[in-house]
Swiss-Prot record:
One of its GO terms (molecular function) is G protein-coupled receptor activity. The keyword Transmembrane applies. Most taste cells may be activated by a limited number of bitter compounds; individual taste cells can discriminate among bitter stimuli. Gene3D superfamilies: Rhodopsin 7-helix transmembrane proteins. The chain crosses the membrane at residues 5-27, 40-62, 82-104, 128-150, 183-205, 232-254, 259-281. InterPro entries: TAS2R. Receptor that may play a role in the perception of bitterness and is gustducin-linked. May play a role in sensing the chemical composition of the gastrointestinal content. The activity of this receptor may stimulate alpha gustducin, mediate PLC-beta-2 activation and lead to the gating of TRPM5. This is Taste receptor type 2 member 62. Keywords: G-protein coupled receptor, Glycoprotein, Membrane, Receptor, Sensory transduction, Taste, Transducer, Transmembrane, Transmembrane helix. Residues 1-4, 63-81, 151-182, 255-258 are extracellular. Belongs to the G-protein coupled receptor T2R family. It is found in: Membrane. Residues 28-39, 105-127, 206-231, 282-312 are cytoplasmic.
């Protein structure tokens, strides 16, 4: 029987996961309805919809995976881990893609590379989304293949009844998977980190110029830049904490029955849940859609609903 602290953290984790699934389900539903009614989505909304869908699945798989492991259904965990690897990789890549898109479209750098990308990024987004899907699929296939080979090797070595050899092989495989996960996770995270930092630097420079021309603190443009910088800072913090939490969790030093494991899971998934909240709050369209959500009104209606006109 789990201890009282463990049960408390399990309850918090499940409620957090359900809230995050509801939040991301709202994003997918609103953007999906807009695409169905208007037959189009902006490039940024395409990335947000893909990111929300991957996070919805990630929270669901994480909740199922942790509950199965805590209930001693260990045979099902390796299969659930395959889905978790897929949706976690998609979440990292779509987060990086969204940060790179905003960096290219909003930043004011005069370098020729940024000028070239600014004109072509919108047309490249569908290809980048397909490329992210292919990369994540290859990552999952290679990871699943490695796990299968490790399982077969472990079974063959156990027949020799040499526990020391089995332990060494297991330790070497764990080190390999840790380094492999660290490598494949680091690529999208570095893209996200560089894009977000560059965008923050660009906005700070623009804000400094604007304050020189309009010294008033209540200027609407100045307030808009300040709010954008705050949301970017929160996004940077939450996504960085999620990435670091993944590394700590890959070390597998916490037992599933230990209540600290569940506390750690609450912390990990709270970061991406809060980042999804930032995405909703910084989008006027989604904020207005949230207010009118109970009515389920058509996104192609009047501009008062916040979706604007649907162009053919």
């Amino acid at each position: 029987m789990p201890s009282l602290p463990t049960l408390i953290f399990i309850a918090i984790f499940c409620l957090e996961s359900l809230a995050a699934m509801l939040q991301n389900g709202f994003l997918v539903t609103m953007l999906g309805r807009e695409w169905v009614r208007c037959r189009m989505l902006s490039t940024s909304d395409m990335i947000v919809a893909c990111l929300a869908a991957s996070r919805f699945c990630l929270h669901g798989v994480a909740m199922a995976n942790n509950l199965l492991a805590s209930l001693d259904f260990s045979r099902a965990v390796p299969y659930m881990n395959i889905f978790w690897d897929l949706f976690n990789a998609l979440t990292l890549w779509f987060t990086a893609l969204l940060a790179a898109f905003y960096c290219v479209k909003i930043s004011s750098f005069s370098h020729p590379t940024f000028a070239w990308l600014k004109w072509r990024i919108s047309r490249l987004v569908p290809k980048l989304i397909k490329g992210s899907l292919i990369i994540c699929g290859l990552e999952v296939i290679s990871s699943a293949t490695g796990n299968i080979l490790f399982g077969q090797r472990k079974v063959s070595l156990s027949s020799y009844r040499n526990e020391t050899l089995v332990y060494r092989v297991q330790a070497s495989f764990q080190l390999y998977f840790f380094l492999y996960d660290g490598f494949v996770w680091s690529i999208p995270f570095l893209l996200f980190l560089v894009s977000t930092v560059l965008l923050i630097v660009s906005l700070c420079w623009q804000l400094g110029q604007m304050r020189d021309l309009r010294p008033g603190p209540c200027d609407p443009s100045t307030q808009a830049y300040t709010m954008a910088l705050k949301s970017l800072t929160f996004s940077l913090i939450f996504c960085t904490l999620y990435f670091l939490s993944l590394f700590a969790s890959a070390l597998k030093i916490i037992n599933f029955q230990n209540h600290w494991h569940w506390a750690w899971e609450v912390l990990i998934y709270a970061n991406i849940c809060l980042h999804s909240t930032v995405l909703v709050l910084r989008s006027p369209k989604l904020k207005k859609g949230l207010k009118t959500w109970p009515q389920l009104q058509c996104p192609c209606d009047a501009g008062s609903q916040g979706f604007g006109r649907c162009w053919p």
